[in-house]
Amino acid sequence: MSDWKVPAAEAMFMLSHLVWLYFVWAIWSFWRRRNKASLAFRLLLAGAFVWMRFVEPNWIARQETAIAIGAPARIVLVSDLHLGAYKGADFVERVVEQINAERADCVLIAGDFLYAPRLPLDPLFAPLKGIKLPVYAVLGNHDRNEFGPSLTEAREIELVDQALQRAGVRLIENQIVNCGGVAVTGIGDRWSGREDARVARAYKGDKPLVALTHNPDTAPDLNAPAGKLVLAAHTHGGQIRIPWLYKKVLPVSGPFDAGLHAPLKPGDPPVFVTTGLGETALPMRLFNPPVIDVLQLH
């Protein structure tokens, strides 16, 4: 992320607190004009803003989904923390606390750890050390080509990778690891030009293969006969999930939204898309709280 976007995101975050002045103005206006309908409308508008800005983005939901793939595994799936301008280590601590309450085989993180962060990164990632399960991850587009402050791309990648490693997070792009009764492989981010599914396509192991990637648009091009399931993120479920409107802003070309999607064509794996934990652009969510997904594979 370029230099100007970092202070811009921080300014947007701080200016949103001015809503409290709007409350004062609405009440003062009522006492001056005694217009109850006008007051009700203004308070409703301000209340909706407060919910979207201050309540829902800080409410961490839990969602459990059973998926049949032919082998048992219990996976905690999270993504899109977007640490930096809007969320920090205190939010991660709450996420880690909830993860540690789960009985699972591993934790998978589907990318986009960052959004307009300031260096150093270690304080943001430090709470991840507290996760008591094996943690495997891939990176997303905001971790690769929209990082910022302005650094060379190679240096950016090195900083992110090393900071996550120090926090106990193992990046598994083009690798295979075991999680319960399944094998998991990581595929790099599509938008960052790092999508490479050769390891998945060459897999011939006995365990069903689960592919972890950031962008669900990777799934139709996977062409991995052993692949039984793709886990992805990126969409935020629209973030501000206003019915009928949010689908117009989903950052995907395929029919991917949130939750479990059936195979697009025979031979394709199903795709599960988590709606993530953080926010980009506007620091708001609606009808779509941050979520920790618990997947019971069987």
What does each model-identified segment do?
Residues 77-79, 106-112, 134-141, 172-174, ...:
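Active-site neighborhood of phospho(di)ester-bond hydrolases with catalytic His/Asp-centered motifs
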Residues 147-169, 173-176, 180-213, 219-221, ...:
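Binuclear metal-dependent hydrolase catalytic cores centered on His/Asp/Glu-rich metal-binding motifs
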Residues 216-296:
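Conserved beta-sheet core of the metallophosphoesterase superfamily
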Residues 13-16, 20-23, 61-66, 201-220, ...:
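Extended recognition/assembly regions associated with phosphoester-bond processing machinery
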Residues 83, 113-116, 141-145, 177, ...:
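Solvent-exposed loop/turn segments at secondary-structure junctions
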Residues 71-170:
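Membrane-embedded segments
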Residues 1-61:
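Non-catalytic terminal accessory segments
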Residues 66-76, 169, 176-185, 205-206, ...:
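Beta-strand-turn-beta hairpins that frame and shape the catalytic cleft
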